[in-house]
Amino acid sequence: MSKKDYYDLLEVGRNASIDEIKKAYKKLALKYHPDRNPGNQEAEEKFKEVTAAYEVLSDSEKRAGYDRYGHEGASGGFQGFSSAGDFSDIFNDFFGGGFGGGASRSRAKRSTTGVSGADLRYDLEITLEDAFKGIQAPIHYVTNVKCDTCQGTGGEGAIKPVQCHTCQGSGRIRTQQGFFTIERTCTTCYGEGEIIQNKCKKCGGSGRRRDEVNISVSIPKGIEEGAKVRISGKGEAGTKGGKSGDLYVYVKIIFHKIFARNKADLHCKVPIRMTLAVLGGEIDIQSIDGAKIKVKVPEGTQTGTKLRCREKGMPYMNSHARGDLYVQVIVETLNPKNLTKKQIELLKALEEEENASVQQQSEGFFSKVKKK
């Protein structure tokens, strides 16, 4: 470290009081502290210099020696990185324990509690018929599973890791600069607090490996689009004995050519003959469960009319009840190209009858108007 004048470093005069020295140091320490200037070597060097200056000038004996003999007279000067001294108390007075806290805090052993694995998502496509009856759906996916060789310990022969000797299991290294405590990640165990001496060859010490998982998922009847099914413990494997995450299966129902769904109700469109719409009758349709049902068509049914079939829709979740089926009739117009000569003659006769009826109604209407 360069031998710069301590008073110049703290930007105070030689007759400065201890309070002035403390105030000056506080300002400069905050300005150049490594936590506020990560990766800035120049700021870190400056911080060391002002800390060394304060360590001498804040002590009456060291200051007297420095004033008489210079740097050589400042016995017990700045020691670089050393154990925490009484300066931690001054640090707490200044900053309330900020910047990683003072050295007075005990070095706790890093928690060895396992880390839970991540939850996973799986998108499953099923048919409307599958949703109606419920199914057991086989699925497969690739994820991190617990290594079966080391049983998740990461060590060869399932030997558990040992405590890091450098950080004593805390995963952090604390060093003292003046009365500032600087805490960094342990470079021996990389913050883990423990070391695997002989890593498992199969998983490389991670305790997990990539593998394909094949399971069967129970999809309940009546399940709706976008619903999710949770399978506990089938997500990503945890580490250090942590539990596995969960698997969430999201259901997507494939478009159906006949039925449209609205919650538990089903809707479909059925073409009917013009004569059936006029005279009424019955039509046979096939429901979602494959059963044939008869639907009554009232006389004079117009195109677009919806006919309700009670409890012929989808089942409700966790219930024996079912929704309804709505049949929308589409009255087909007759195509002359597909009619026989006799059918055309009958239609013409019907047209003449209708025209005569309309004519009589019109004459009756206008005669009433004239009388008025």
From Swiss-Prot:
SMART domains: DnaJ. A zinc finger (CR-type) spans 134-212. This is Chaperone protein DnaJ. Its cofactor is Zn(2+). Keywords: Chaperone, Cytoplasm, DNA replication, Metal-binding, Repeat, Stress response, Zinc, Zinc-finger. It comes from Wolbachia sp. subsp. Drosophila simulans (strain wRi). CXXCXGXG motif repeats lie at residues 147-154, 164-171, 186-193, 200-207. It holds the Pfam family DnaJ. Homodimer. GO terms for biological process: chaperone cofactor-dependent protein refolding; DNA replication; protein refolding; response to heat.
